[in-house]
């Protein structure tokens, strides 16, 4: 009977632990639980990465405004200024003495209006040979056979006529056209012109 009573007292003296009891107050146990909670949060953040930031796009329809300098350049200056500023193109102006030194028309496309006008200002250089008809015909035959690369084209012999009739006036004439004044000078250096034939330098106003 005494043994049974002692056992009951021992059981009743031990503290009862229920599900609603407070957490453990041991510092070591609390540290382990804190580390476990941090690891769980870290794993959760790895499985759920942050979504990338969305860039805002500019609304359509907006254009970059032009500076006053660009507007002045487009309105005030010509095509030559735009060409030299944009592509580095240099336009070589010609002197009055170079007018009439080209035999071919410039191409229509691929160049500025100023460059085309400068090229059109160059007219083909010529020489006018004046003498007897037979002398000029023999000279034409000789230079076509020996100096064909030193001129562009050559005419037949011709005469001026009177303004009121068809009578011929003066000596016969023949024209020789060149690409440049350099070619004409080279022609005059190579070709031997008879003393009875006069040489007159000139240029066409156009080709």
Swiss-Prot record:
Residue ranges, annotated region (Disordered): 1-111
Cellular component terms per the entry's GO annotation: host cell nucleus
Keyword Iron-sulfur: no
Composition bias type Basic and acidic residues, residue spans: 67-80
Gene Ontology terms, MF aspect: DNA binding; DNA-binding transcription factor activity
Keywords carried by this UniProt record: Host nucleus
Function: Plays a role in limiting the replication of viral DNA in keratinocytes. Recruits the host NCoR/SMRT complex to viral replication foci to mediate repression of both viral replication and transcription.
Protein name as it appears in the record: Protein E8^E2C
Organism this protein belongs to: Human papillomavirus type 63
């Amino acid at each position: 009977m005494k043994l049974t009573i002692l056992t009951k007292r021992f059981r009743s003296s031990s503290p009862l632990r229920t599900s609603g009891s407070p957490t453990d107050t041991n510092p070591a146990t609390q540290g382990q639980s804190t580390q476990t909670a941090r690891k769980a949060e870290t794993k959760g953040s790895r499985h759920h990465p942050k979504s990338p930031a969305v860039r805002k796009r500019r609304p359509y329809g907006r254009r970059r405004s032009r500076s006053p300098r660009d507007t002045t350049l487009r309105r005030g200056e010509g095509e030559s200024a735009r060409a030299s500023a944009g592509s580095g193109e240099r336009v070589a102006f010609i002197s009055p003495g170079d007018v009439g030194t080209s035999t071919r028309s410039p191409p229509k496309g691929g160049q500025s209006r100023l460059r085309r006008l400068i090229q059109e200002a160059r007219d083909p250089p010529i020489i006018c040979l004046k003498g007897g008809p037979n002398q000029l015909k023999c000279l034409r035959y000789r230079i076509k056979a020996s100096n064909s690369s030193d001129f562009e084209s050559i005419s037949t012999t011709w005469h001026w006529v009177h303004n009121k009739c068809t009578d011929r006036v003066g000596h016969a004439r023949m024209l020789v056209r060149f690409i440049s004044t350099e070619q004409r000078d080279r022609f005059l250096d190579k070709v031997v012109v008879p003393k009875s034939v006069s040489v007159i330098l000139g240029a066409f106003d156009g080709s």
